[in-house]
UniProtKB/Swiss-Prot annotation:
Keyword annotations from UniProtKB, A to Z: DNA-binding, Host cell membrane, Host endoplasmic reticulum, Host membrane, Host microsome, Membrane, Phosphoprotein, Transport, Viral movement protein
Gene Ontology cellular component terms for the protein in this record: host cell endoplasmic reticulum membrane; host cell plasma membrane; membrane
Signal peptide: none
Organism: Potato yellow mosaic virus (isolate Venezuela)
Tagged with keyword Signal: no
TM region positions: none
GO biological process terms on file: transport of virus in host, cell to cell
Modified how: Phosphorylated.
Lineage: Viruses, Monodnaviria, Shotokuvirae, Cressdnaviricota, Repensiviricetes
Name of the protein in question: Movement protein BC1
């Protein structure tokens, strides 16, 4: 295939594949895309460049009866990922809907590896026989190269519906989310200095997580000094009911001082006098003499 670099020299023209007929299949079937020629890829590789897809257009043109039903699912996969994580974007649209699918890549790939992108289709819930040549697909790719990768602003996939009897309510498309990242701190012997005031400086034998206050919980080997500096750390993990100390001592004392029992001075004196007499009586009574036989 003839393919040339365009001006500026780091961008390729749109590379079009042949508009070929494809057989109806319920299983994922590859759509052949045309990529830059081996010579063009070798030129970019010799310049130590990496490559990305700027824009990919997949043209779908149906050739089925008007009473045909079913849905077509088109998927773009990145084969650098494991099989269950390779899906990058997907579209679902009616079998009889002529449509253009648009995809914009968000990553570079090395020219030392095989081109990783693969395009697949399958048909579901249809009344058309399998292996019927139900449609034609055509792919158009625009790629570019760079000396090194840079962050690429995300552009969502989209569609252009060409059949008037269908609207955007009849199609759906999606894109994979960003991969999750969880920092895993490097454990080191100097973690006893975590939390000390002052500018953070990484020293030999230390990691950023161990020096910063945003690191995760410390290991079992941390020093006693660290425990003394952070006596009450991780208390936020307890529930509010556990951390609530209850009413203060002043409130408790005030509540105890408040009573519904009232006594006059005379009644209080009588109570004290009676109590004292009972105590004297119980302590001063002589014991009964024992009889010896």
């Amino acid at each position: 295939m003839n393919s040339q670099l365009v001006n500026p020299p780091h961008a390729f023209n749109y590379i079009e594949s042949q508009r070929d007929e494809y057989q109806l299949s319920h299983d994922l079937t590859e759509i052949i895309l045309q990529f830059p020629s081996t010579a063009a890829q070798l030129t970019a590789r010799l310049s130590r460049s990496c490559m990305k897809i700027d824009h990919c257009v997949i043209e779908y043109r149906q050739q089925v009866p008007i009473n045909a039903t079913g849905s077509v699912i088109v998927e773009i996969h990145d084969k650098r990922m494991t099989d269950n994580e390779s899906l990058q974007a997907s579209w679902t649209f009616p079998l009889r809907c002529n449509i253009d699918l648009h995809y914009f890549s968000a990553s570079f790939f090395s020219l030392k590896d095989p081109i990783p992108w693969k395009l697949y289709y399958r048909v579901s819930d249809t009344n058309v026989h399998q292996r019927t040549h139900f449609a034609k697909f055509k792919g158009k790719l625009k790629l570019s190269t760079a000396k090194h990768s840079v962050d690429i602003p995300f552009r969502a996939p989209t569609v252009k519906i060409l059949s008037k009897q269908f609207t955007d309510k009849d199609v759906d498309f999606s894109h994979v989310d960003y991969g999750r990242w969880e920092r895993k701190p490097i454990r080191c012997a100097s973690m006893s200095r975590v939390g000390l005031r002052g500018p953070i400086e990484i020293r030999p034998g230390e990691s950023w997580a161990s020096r910063s206050t945003i690191g995760v919980g410390q290991s079992e080997g941390e020093s006693e000094i660290e425990n003394e500096l952070h006596t009450y750390r991780d208390l936020q993990r307890l529930g509010a009911s556990v951390l609530d100390p209850g009413e203060s001592a002043s409130i408790v004392g005030a509540n105890m001082a408040q009573s519904n029992i009232t006594m006059s001075v005379a009644q209080l004196n009588e109570l004290v006098r009676t109590t004292v007499q009972e105590c004297i009586k119980s302590n001063c009574n002589s014991s009964q003499p024992k009889n010896f036989k």
